[in-house]
């Protein structure tokens, strides 16, 4: 089996003397930013930021931070293999395997950064907890001559912001509900006023056009569906916190 081959490969590899990840990263000066810092910077000028999600493509596909691009330092299969070795064999061997997988992506990473016009942008990297994956990807980016920052606490810290915000009672803004029959032009009206008034478009956040049309308009335009409740909450939070009209013109 593939697992048997993987374990044979690891058993025949000498990992003695491999430094810890902490030791490897200690020679790099990488700035740390909080989720709040990143949201503020995105709101000020999101075009000046390249926000990189270092998690696997599966994790990224389920939900992510707003405006982020995915560069999996470990893809789905590599993450599975590394986790298997970590649990069943040894932490040192798992680290060695993860670094081997990651280092093989150096040229792909270089092209990814060039494609995203990174020379004119601030690079910020995050993973699930703000640990090994984001740290190592930031190291690789540094080795290519850039100066990335890492998000402390990772995606989990962003989710805490979202959960805390929607758990507030009462809701921090007074809301006016726009109602009407399907096809009466509610969405068009929201779009018209969104430049001057704060707007929450629930249908857009859910990628769902009412009980009559459902996801059909989004399918026609090849818009990715919202995979889960977490992604829906993230979309709502993004609509509020990256929209300056919420802070400048909130209706009281």
Locations of regions flagged by a protein language model:
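Conserved nucleotide-sensing/catalytic segment adjacent to the nucleotide-binding pocket
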Residues: 198-252
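A short glycine-rich beta-strand->turn/loop micro-motif centered on a GG-aromatic cluster
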Residues: 145-160, 204-206
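Short, charged, surface-exposed secondary-structure boundary motifs
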Residues: 78-85, 158-163, 209-215
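Conserved beta-strand scaffold positions in the cores of enzyme catalytic domains, especially
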Residues: 32, 51, 68-70, 148-150, ...
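Glycine-rich phosphate-binding P-loop
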Residues: 174-195
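Flexible, polar/low-complexity N-terminal or interdomain linker segments that lie immediately upstream
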Residues: 1-66, 163-170, 175-179
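Catalytic cysteine-centered active loop of the rhodanese-like fold, especially the PTP/DSP P-loop
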Residues: 1, 96-152
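Positively charged, proline/Ser/Thr-rich regional signature most characteristic
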Residues: 42-117
């Amino acid at each position: 089996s593939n697992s048997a081959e993987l374990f044979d490969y690891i058993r025949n590899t000498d990992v003695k003397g491999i430094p810890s990840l902490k030791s490897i990263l200690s020679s790099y000066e990488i700035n740390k930013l909080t989720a709040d810092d990143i949201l503020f910077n995105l709101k000020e000028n999101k075009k000046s930021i390249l926000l990189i999600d270092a998690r696997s493509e599966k994790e990224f596909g389920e939900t992510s931070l707003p405006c982020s691009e995915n560069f999996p330092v470990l893809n789905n299969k590599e993450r599975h293999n590394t986790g298997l070795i970590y649990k069943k064999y040894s932490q040192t061997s798992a680290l060695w395997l993860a670094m081997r997988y990651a280092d093989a992506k150096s040229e792909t990473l270089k092209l990814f950064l060039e494609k995203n016009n990174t020379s004119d942008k601030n690079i910020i990297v995050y993973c699930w907890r703000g640990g090994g994956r984001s740290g190592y990807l930031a190291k690789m980016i540094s080795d290519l001559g850039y100066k990335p920052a890492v998000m402390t606490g990772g995606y989990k810290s962003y989710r805490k912001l979202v959960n805390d915000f929607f758990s507030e009672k009462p809701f921090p803004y007074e809301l006016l509900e726009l109602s009407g029959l399907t096809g009466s032009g509610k969405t068009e009206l929201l779009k018209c006023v969104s430049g001057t008034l704060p707007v929450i478009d629930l249908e857009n956040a859910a990628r769902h056009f009412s009980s009559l049309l459902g996801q059909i308009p989004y399918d026609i335009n090849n818009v990715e569906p919202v995979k889960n409740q977490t992604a829906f909450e993230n979309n709502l939070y993004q609509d509020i916190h990256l929209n300056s009209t919420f802070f400048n013109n909130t209706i009281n």
